[in-house]
Amino acid sequence: MAGIGFELKKLFRRKGLFASLRAYGYAGIICTGPMLLGVVLQLGILLLCSWVGAPRDQQDLLVCMITYTLLFSLTVTSFFSMPVTRYLADMLYEEQEHTILPSFWGSGSLMLVLGCPLYGLFLLVSGATLLQGLLCLWLFAEMIVNWNGMSYLTAIKDYRGILCSFLAAIALAFGLGAVLVVLLGCPVLEGMLFAVAMGYGLMMIWDVVLLYRYFPQSDASPWAFLRWVDAFLPLAFTGLCTNLGLFAHLVICWAGPVGVQVKGLFYGAAYYDVPALIAFLTILITSVNFVVSVEVNFYPKYRNYYSLFNDGGVVGDIVTAEEEMLAVLNRELRFTALKQLFATAAVLSLEGTLLDLLPLGFNDLMHGYFRTLCVGYGLYAVGNTLLMILLYFTDYRGAVAAAAVFAASAGGLTALSMAFDPAFYGFGFLIGAALFYLVALFRLDAFTSNLPYRVLGRQPIVAESRSGWFTRLGLFLEHHKGTEREEKKNES
């Protein structure tokens, strides 16, 4: 992400309000792509359904199906996204670009094989019709490929191409939905699901074309990345736990007193979901700032510091470089926290006026949820920034510990809050996010207090290679692929 941050930084050097707005627009879409696209599509589809006079139960079921598909796909990809990103970074550093495309298809295939049967089984017993289930499964498969592709797209630094794929997906989904439902008279639920699936499908094709334009095709093993999953297993659980902590409170509230059974196993809690959806947008400030400010300003100091160890720098230069790096890091983290604080305070002061202007039917309970979740998401955003810095310093144990605390506390405390008045439901996530922030902060402070020891003293004396279940799976798949090649050669 630092690479694309440097590209986006060029936009911020241009003067003028329009240039700044365009730069922040690019950064916001790229940095929070999956969730932002989901939010825009959800809100747009609701407006379109209201415009055509769709029954409320159909609207609720449509939102539930898209939300379930989105969360299922993000959960599956969250386990593999960080190890795959690490593999991608290592291959680019070693100038082995020919391994990139095979790993993209290998990782995507594995996620599809793991995720589609599980989600398909859920759809079978969920109460959805056959057509609705097939459309949801199709959308799920597209989302898996898209979210996996986001890790690869940031490497090519083509932010305009990424932006165009997002805009094209939204335009096609809305346009096709209007044609199917308004002009052709198709059923609202099935027509809009098909339109959304086509929109995500266009984005998938667009992104794959971008990848093929930048990376060469080759016969390299598509399963080599699995060794990275074993070698960096804490990264996999860091991604999974962060995802669980971020979304568990929503699922728990669906099953709580404010939840409503829409159809079969599809539940929703509009009084909680809508405030959470809008409150989530407040973290855009920190997400954008991390890429275009924290990483861009911190990374050169970070690279210089570690290059002194690799290139035989003298002790005095190393000490000076460490002081400069940590000074820049502390300054950027402080500015990030202040920006998020001001953004949250501004939203809280204006939310009563602005939200009442929207046709969302906010009541006092929803306003309370919104205020609570705004603070919670703000703490999460800053805590997630600290988590990313821990990953920069390869403190994978500290990162997975912070993420695990977040997942356990946010989910556990939200479940505990179900025994109290509904007004307290959002506090479980808020406290979990606060603990996430504090654990990450204290861990980063402890880790950087003795950085030379962390860099040198904790390294293994001899090289270690971890061979676990994923490595064995990769060897098995590669052996199977080699056997098929031999059979084809013999036949020819």
Regions found by a protein language model. Give the residues of each.
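Alpha-helical transmembrane segments of multi-pass membrane proteins
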Residues: 67-72, 108-113, 121-153, 343-349, ...
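Transmembrane helical elements of multi-pass membrane transporters/channels
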Residues: 195-199, 203-295
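Specific pore-lining/lateral-gate transmembrane helices of multi-pass inner-membrane transport
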Residues: 92-104, 273-357
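N-terminal membrane topogenesis motif
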Residues: 1-42, 60, 64, 226-235, ...
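Alpha-helical transmembrane segments of multi-pass membrane transporters/permeases
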Residues: 153-179, 390-412
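Small-residue-rich midsections of specific transmembrane alpha-helices
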Residues: 63-89, 243, 247, 276-301
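Hydrophobic alpha-helical transmembrane segments
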Residues: 165-212, 423-445
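Hydrophobic faces of transmembrane alpha-helices in multi-pass small-molecule transporters and flippases
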Residues: 20-36, 163, 221-248, 333-342, ...
